Amino acid sequence: MDVLAEEFGSLTPEQLTAPIPTVEEKWRLLPAFLKVKGLVKQHIDSFNYFINVEIKKIMKANEKVTSDADPMWYLKYLNIYVGLPDVEESFNVTRPVSPHECRLRDMTYSAPITVDIEYTRGSQRIIRNALPIGRMPIMLRSSNCVLTGKTPAEFAKLNECPLDPGGYFIVKGVEKVILIQEQLSKNRIIVEADRKGAVGASVTSSTHEKKSRTNMAVKQGRFYLRHNTLSEDIPIVIIFKAMGVESDQEIVQMIGTEEHVMAAFGPSLEECQKAQIFTQMQALKYIGNKVRRQRMWGGGPKKTKIEEARELLASTILTHVPVKEFNFRAKCIYTAVMVRRVILAQGDNKVDDRDYYGNKRLELAGQLLSLLFEDLFKKFNSEMKKIADQVIPKQRAAQFDVVKHMRQDQITNGMVNAISTGNWSLKRFKMDRQGVTQVLSRLSYISALGMMTRISSQFEKTRKVSGPRSLQPSQWGMLCPSDTPEGEACGLVKNLALMTHITTDMEDGPIIKLAGNLGVEDVNLLCGEELSYPNVFLVFLNGNILGVIRDHKKLVSTFRLMRRAGYINEFVSISTNLTDRCVYISSDGGRLCRPYIIVKKQKPAVTNKHMEELAQGYRNFEDFLHESLVEYLDVNEENDCNIALYEHTINKDTTHLEIEPFTLLGVCAGLIPYPHHNQSPRNTYQCAMGKQAMGTIGYNQRNRIDTLMYLLAYPQKPMVKTKTIELIDFEKLPAGQNATVAVMSYSGYDIEDALVLNKASLDRGFGRCLVYKNAKCTLKRYTNQTFDKVMGPMLDAATRKPIWRHEILDADGICSPGEKVENKQVLVNKSMPTVTQIPLEGSNVPQQPQYKDVPITYKGATDSYIEKVMISSNAEDAFLIKMLLRQTRRPEIGDKFSSRHGQKGVCGLIVPQEDMPFCDSGICPDIIMNPHGFPSRMTVGKLIELLAGKAGVLDGRFHYGTAFGGSKVKDVCEDLVRHGYNYLGKDYVTSGITGEPLEAYIYFGPVYYQKLKHMVLDKMHARARGPRAVLTRQPTEGRSRDGGLRLGEMERDCLIGYGASMLLLERLMISSDAFEVDVCGQCGLLGYSGWCHYCKSSCHVSSLRIPYACKLLFQELQSMNIIPRLKLAKYNE
């Protein structure tokens, strides 16, 4: 007791016995959060914002089209809206369409974009409503989608899976995802050093009208402004003078009056002096001479150089800082701040980190589509203007009606092409990106879900730079630390963590007003001197200077109180930067943020009472935000906060509490049980393999006709689950089976991670899978009124039965469901006309069109069964026939399996059950795994999973293996002992071969195993004779073309090294492309059938065997006027 008293001496007994306040059920906030935000909601929210808000802004910015030909004519957009997805049945008859129908019929799931316009026709003014101008592909589960707000029963009627995440598009029947794109944030000053170590600052400005980049460079201690519209760098002082700050003293005051700042800025002032520039006019003239001449189209009054320079400064340099009526005050201060930052960075080498995640913005589908739509809409309008300019001046009967000239396909095709190819090349925004969209991978439910949270950074994969690839501390909680691919894309492709939310743009008007009320002073009212006082902080809003504040701490705390009370949007963040003396307020889109519980007076604001109300359904997540119990923090604001991971680590400085620590992992890493007991790269491997595991795709998987679909015949829930598994509904659509594993060495076939499988388990369906492939064909109509036909099967003349190739065809020429189909058998006996174009005048064409056979045949080494045949029509009104082919495969030697800990292995041996070892309760293992896989891999999580699984089976309950928590090993082992098993999880095992007990106890229990998509049947390839290439007469290459295996240059060198010359001859010529060739001994050229065309004789012609490729090379060289001659000599001389 005395020792205790010394330790807790200062505390009273009452304080000692008071319980630490813990919120037991606080993880219940997660499902509530995931209902409203997170995972796929990012894409959906962003798309909704685009089609409900952003598209109207784009229309407002380009609302009027006028023509130079007729000043009276105009076209004005009054409103624009996106409708509901539909499909045109016949001319002008539409009906609503479901996503599943678009998938089956290879159509685009899109909705009409309609506008209300007002325009002139002749002298009258006309208003037209609901005029379609194109079609917009619709994201599934967005506000305009058919599936929004439906019950599970209605989902079933629409053939959709209620667990399907949505957030993707269906374009031409293919599911496409727009990946999240990572960008450096716009409108922020970034100070960095170049390769030589010179410090400079750069700003990428971006507004709705213009995008440009401005650089501040230092050369020989002088400061210059660099911009691509200027032909050379311009001294910074001249820029200040051109903006109207003519006195040197005021310039220095703006930049800073400290000694070292003034010393650093001195040379720049002298340079301006040398250039003899003192007034604003002189400065503007100097800049005007340095402007790059743009080719001006069309007339228009020529601007003087001074006007041109002033325009340039106002609108192009630092575009995002607004200039009203040439009042350059704000822009001057911004430029001064840039100079000051560079000077300070030179002094103490504090350059910004480009990889810091607060400097990054993520672009979502909505932002990318809005850029694309803006580009297409402007093109559409300029096309209209062009037509108006052409048509109005012409004399004709009817008046010019612009509606007749609106081409709908322009916007439609632009959207569809961009999404289906993934190429966003918009000249207008200097944007050229490939691979923005990807096909949604439907290998398993997890691969589809994991694709929704993927972030792609626009960085060349080829450069081996470690900076952008490494794990940044600022990514904590925002990005998953484990889920990134291995290889060249490592660290460039990232995934969001479980609770991350990406913000969308917000109106900044209210924030500006509020800041003014909280004591932010306008910059225009201050002299330069006041800006560099030590207690004056600059206030930035989204990169623009808002004003200055004397008491920044009060501003920040009041601002946060207002946000918690719900007066400001919950996603606005405010943070201070003490080194640069700034307060940053951000309300722009693309910032990463996540929710935290607020801590007041060392107690979390959320209590157990709140959690009970949540469980009973009185509260939802929004209520927690409004009552200031939970708030969102972004990366920059996290730096000002002190966040505790658990309740018992809260101290007096703590401001927030983490909701659940396991949410800093993403979707794929969340499936791993006990990941905190594994070596880090193992979790990364599992993240990649979990996406390749076969299982279930969705409740509608039997109705889908995909190009390739792998399904497990009997998937099971994992015995050891995690909180994440429940949150993302993995146990409703699992991918894997609980296998009983014995960790022991058995035979020599389990070396290097190979597994030994039990034949009896395979017979009972362990690891059995279905492989579905599809074959499809379209029957088109051609321009000359001919069309494709399907012919009936061809009958054998003698037996009056169909020939073998047509055995499985029905009378209509299409294969019948349920039939077994072998290689080279015909699935659809289609024939097409020989002439499909309209014939030329005067050419004789047979009256009756002639047909040639183009059958759709089955290609595959193993037989398949026809599951079903679908006949429909696609968007072009061509007939569409889709067949689904099925194979059932049982595991065989060489198939790949993996546990959930990155322990992959192939099946090395299949043993009959009577030879397998068994434990004393008579259980035989399904899998025997070699124990050498554990020590070097350090996957302790797998050992614990086996224990927890075993205890769970005996107890009849599921154990949790959640990251940083989960069931304790001690408790699990005590459960085992209670049921009469060994505390260590080891069993007494009898050998199946000798019937004697094994000399060691064997670690024995259930582990969740995944069957991966890599199967031997799809990879095995060998050939003796087979097809050859036409040009070189060598065997073709590749498994699909039944090609040969190439003996390359290195293999050739090896054989030369061994001196095996006959083997070389046999491999490189005789077995490849031997060719008899005639050579003339006199001139050394190739002859033909015993005659030399050059010597005009057959006296000296001999016959040789050389590779055909060699003969081809000689002839190709001859065609280039290089003549290789073959010298012949007698063999025996």
Curated annotation (Swiss-Prot):
Disulfide topology: none
Location(s) in or outside the cell: Nucleus; Cytoplasm, Cytosol
Binding of Mg(2+), residues: D753
Binding site for RNA: K186, R213, Q438, Q692, K896, K904, K1019
SUPFAM superfamilies: beta and beta-prime subunits of DNA dependent RNA-polymerase
One example of a Gene Ontology biological process annotation: snRNA transcription by RNA polymerase III
Keywords in alphabetical order: Antiviral defense, Cytoplasm, DNA-directed RNA polymerase, Immunity, Innate immunity, Magnesium, Metal-binding, Nucleotidyltransferase, Nucleus, Transcription, Transferase, Zinc, Zinc-finger
A single GO molecular function term of this UniProt record: ribonucleoside binding
Pfam families registered for this protein in UniProt: RNA_pol_Rpb2_1 (PF04563), RNA_pol_Rpb2_2 (PF04561), RNA_pol_Rpb2_3 (PF04565), RNA_pol_Rpb2_4 (PF04566), RNA_pol_Rpb2_5 (PF04567), RNA_pol_Rpb2_6 (PF00562), RNA_pol_Rpb2_7 (PF04560)
Signal peptide limits: none
Chief localization: nucleus
Root EC class: transferase
Cofactor note text: Two Mg(2+) ions are coordinated by both the catalytic residues and the nucleic acid substrate to enhance substrate recognition and catalytic efficiency.
Marked site positions, Critical in trapping poly(dT) in Pol III-mediated transcription termination: F429
Zinc finger feature spans (C4-type): 1080-1095
Binding residues for DNA nontemplate strand: R195, D432
Reaction equations catalysed: RNA(n) + a ribonucleoside 5'-triphosphate = RNA(n+1) + diphosphate
Residues engaged in binding Zn(2+): C1080, C1083, C1092, C1095
GO cellular component: cytosol; mitochondrion; RNA polymerase III complex
Family affiliation: Belongs to the RNA polymerase beta chain family.
Complex and partners: Component of the RNA polymerase III (Pol III) complex consisting of 17 subunits: a ten-subunit catalytic core composed of POLR3A/RPC1, POLR3B/RPC2, POLR1C/RPAC1, POLR1D/RPAC2, POLR3K/RPC10, POLR2E/RPABC1, POLR2F/RPABC2, POLR2H/RPABC3, POLR2K/RPABC4 and POLR2L/RPABC5; a mobile stalk composed of two subunits POLR3H/RPC8 and CRCP/RPC9, protruding from the core and functioning primarily in transcription initiation; and additional subunits homologous to general transcription factors of the RNA polymerase II machinery, POLR3C/RPC3-POLR3F/RPC6-POLR3G/RPC7 heterotrimer required for transcription initiation and POLR3D/RPC4-POLR3E/RPC5 heterodimer involved in both transcription initiation and termination.
Protein purpose: Catalytic core component of RNA polymerase III (Pol III), a DNA-dependent RNA polymerase which synthesizes small non-coding RNAs using the four ribonucleoside triphosphates as substrates. Synthesizes 5S rRNA, snRNAs, tRNAs and miRNAs from at least 500 distinct genomic loci. Pol III-mediated transcription cycle proceeds through transcription initiation, transcription elongation and transcription termination stages. During transcription initiation, Pol III is recruited to DNA promoters type I, II or III with the help of general transcription factors and other specific initiation factors.
Stated name of the protein: DNA-directed RNA polymerase III subunit RPC2
Organism: Mus musculus
